[in-house]
Design a protein with these regions (language model features):
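Amphipathic, positively biased hydrophobic alpha-helical segments used for protein targeting
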Residues: 11, 139, 302-303
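Flexible, low-complexity junctional segments that flank or bridge functional domains
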Residues: 19-282, 306, 312
Length: 334
């Protein structure tokens, strides 16, 4: 059983298993397996990267695996896979990450940079400040380095992934931006701050608490929901995941499916609202949708298209964002 886990969506899967704790990995065997099976299973692995370069890189990673250690070897392998140019093909190195080496650093990327929006209570003075450097490296350099760990399809993907990777002290140490179990942060105004890992399960988090939240933000953690705004004659569909009870039952766990909302029932409700209320605009919001099963969305959209043909006065708007990915992108094109 292979210990190298590959997350391969949309192509035939490769047998794999997690390495618990990162010990006992036979990197030579796993990398040989990767080098032979990934090209065989992928529809066109070398569309953007030369096969000879790939094989040479595999050899170099094998040669350094013993000295580099499991985590660094996994990252080197993922950096190679990212260069292949397929964002649905990746090595899931998270299983080798130490959860006790996560910085309490929630970041939001806005137009002028990365801002701290969440941290531990003892670091709350960081809140609202823009991050400008880590150690001696400008934040742009840190972003460039972290971006080698995933395939960059577009700028939106970078803005989505970087805030997720940034809090990992292990990653910052791998790239040489942090040392001695802590990160030296520089904030706007040239303020410096030493940040150490914090227990992710511990209470006492500090975060911005706005007075009110827009509908799409307040409901961002549900699979899908809707709201009719009668004064504006707007029907708002918030589609956060291409998933639901039916998809779970078909592709994963029938037992878990019972606890999930039914997209079929949601669709019936949606068209009941459309047919029973004056609607001038439909907003179909997929800004938080990272994918799943595109088929359910396609069927809904096709039915919606037929409805709109009969009601040409209704304007439809589709909202996407940096987290829109995979099946959600397909549904956007639908």
């Amino acid at each position: 059983m292979k210990k190298l886990l590959l997350l391969l969506l949309g192509i035939a899967s490769i047998p794999a298993a997690f390495s618990q704790g990162g010990s006992g990995i036979d990197w030579a065997a796993d990398l040989d397996y990767l080098a032979s099976e990934l090209p065989a299973k992928h529809c066109n692995l070398f569309a953007k990267y030369d096969k000879a370069q790939f094989e040479t890189a595999i050899g170099a990673i094998k040669a350094s695996a013993g000295e580099a250690g499991d985590f660094a070897t996994a990252l080197k392998t993922q950096q190679l896979i990212a260069r292949l140019g397929d964002s649905h093909t990746m090595l899931y190195f998270n299983q080798l990450m130490n959860r006790q080496q996560i910085l309490p650093l929630g970041l939001l990327w806005v137009s002028d940079g990365l801002y701290v929006i969440q941290t531990a209570e003892e670091n709350k003075e960081l809140l609202g400040h823009r991050l400008t450097a880590v150690g001696k490296a400008p934040v742009e350099t840190v972003i460039d380095s972290l971006s080698t760990l995933f395939t960059v399809d577009n700028e939106a993907m970078v803005k989505s992934m970087i805030p997720q990777l940034f809090p990992s002290l292990q990653l910052l140490e791998y790239f040489g931006f942090a040392h001695n179990g802590q990160a030296e942060l520089t904030l706007d105004g040239d303020k410096t701050y030493t940040l150490k890992p914090s227990d992710p399960q511990r209470a006492g988090r500090a975060a911005f608490q706005p007075d009110s939240l827009p509908f799409a933000i307040a409901e961002r953690n549900v699979l899908f929901t809707d709201r009719y705004f009668p004064e504006e004659k707007i029907y708002y569909i918030l589609y956060n995941s291409c998933w639901g009870r039916e998809s779970e039952a078909e592709f994963k766990s029938r037992e878990k499916a019972a606890s999930l909302p039914s997209f079929t029932e949601f669709g019936q409700k949606a068209f009941g609202i459309l047919q029973g209320n004056p609607v001038g605009k439909i907003i179909f919001d997929m800004r938080n949708n990272g994918g799943g099963n595109s088929a359910q969305g396609t069927a809904f959209i096709e039915r919606l298209a037929r409805f709109l043909e009969q009601h040409p006065g209704i304007k439809t708007y589709v909202v996407i964002g940096r987290s829109t990915f995979s099946s959600a992108t397909l549904n956007t094109m639908d």
